[in-house]
């Protein structure tokens, strides 16, 4: 049963990845977008729990850690994309299951049997093949530190989800704590970035106040971006896929082995790859095709092992 929850979660996160990919081509404020994603999760979790009436417990406070490390992972990932090679950061985002397997063994003594280990390695290898790019080299690892932080933070987010289930925390209250924490952090981040942008614009305006003819092009450029309200509401729409996935993640971790659940969820990248191939008409490289095949073989081994 855990596999069905994890696979359904991967589909939801795959849809989220597709929406993120589409949104990345638009002139928007990413912090405001992510604020919308987490604000949507807050509202949906709160409303559903009004009817579901899931109980609150001390374990629900683990959701604060989930929100914190989710914020750190997203912030580090975007920072890595800004200062480093996109292909390198993308590769690190495929490695959190490795962190999860190692820490789950250290913390809780969880072990994989031979077939589970084989399936895990094949799936991780397939994910890395999909994310690998020929422009990655040992001589050019700029931004690698942000990729490592991203990898660890995503892994700890998964482990926090598992810990919440071990403490008997209900899904909706835990997610509500996670999304409230994330909303606050992304809201602060958006506010600070907006203040910095306003300060920079004021400096430019002061320097160019005697050149009125040259002050209109920047304004026209700014108008091409999405408005704050449009970005926020789009983020809230994307957030529906995010919380749908998270509502499936927690029962998957409750029923399954932590590392295996994490690696199945990480296969959401496959759906983004299929979207790029069949909707955007992008051709698979040999590595991507091989990685897709490996990942599917790994899932087959995992099902046979079960």
Spans of model-derived segments:
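Alpha-helical transmembrane segments of compact multi-pass small-molecule transporters, enriched
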Residues: 40-44, 92-106, 121-122, 181-185, ...
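Selected transmembrane alpha-helices and immediately adjacent juxtamembrane segments
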Residues: 2, 142-173
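C-terminal transmembrane-helix exit sites in multi-pass transporters
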Residues: 49, 77, 97-118, 128, ...
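Juxtamembrane helix-start motifs in multi-pass secondary transporters
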Residues: 33-34, 89, 173-174, 261
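Membrane-interface interhelical linkers
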Residues: 1-65, 75-84, 132-148, 180-255, ...
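Hydrophobic transmembrane alpha-helices of multi-pass small-molecule transport proteins
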Residues: 38-45, 103-105, 115-132, 287-306
């Amino acid at each position: 049963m855990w596999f069905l929850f994890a696979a359904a979660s991967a589909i939801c996160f795959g849809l989220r990845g597709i929406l993120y990919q589409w949104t990345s081509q638009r002139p928007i404020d990413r912090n405001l977008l992510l604020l919308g994603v987490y604000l949507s999760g807050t509202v949906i979790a709160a409303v559903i729990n009004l009817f579901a009436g899931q109980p609150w417990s001390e374990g629900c406070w683990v959701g604060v850690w989930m929100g914190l490390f989710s914020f750190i992972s997203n912030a580090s990932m975007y920072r890595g994309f800004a200062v480093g090679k996109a292909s390198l950061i993308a590769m690190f985002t495929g490695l959190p299951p490795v962190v999860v397997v190692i820490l789950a063994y250290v913390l809780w003594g969880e072990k994989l049997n031979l077939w589970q280990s084989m399936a895990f390695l094949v799936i991780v290898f397939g994910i890395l093949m999909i994310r690998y790019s020929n422009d990655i080299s040992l001589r050019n690892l700029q931004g690698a530190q942000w990729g490592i932080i991203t990898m660890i933070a995503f892994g700890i987010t998964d482990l926090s989800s598992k810990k919440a289930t071990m403490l008997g925390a209900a899904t909706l209250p835990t997610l509500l704590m996670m999304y409230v924490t994330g909303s606050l952090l992304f809201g602060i981040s958006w506010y600070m970035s907006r203040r910095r942008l306003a300060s920079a614009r004021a400096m430019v305006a002061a320097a160019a106040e005697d050149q009125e003819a040259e002050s209109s092009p920047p304004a026209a450029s700014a108008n091409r971006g999405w408005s704050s309200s449009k970005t926020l509401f789009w983020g809230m729409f994307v957030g529906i896929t995010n919380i749908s996935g998270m509502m499936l993640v927690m029962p998957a971790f409750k029923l399954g082995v932590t590392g295996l659940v994490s690696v199945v969820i990480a296969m959401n990248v496959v759906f983004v790859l299929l979207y790029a191939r069949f909707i955007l008409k992008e051709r698979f490289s040999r590595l991507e095709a091989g990685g897709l095949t490996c990942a599917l073989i790994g899932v087959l081994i995992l099902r046979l092992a079960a």
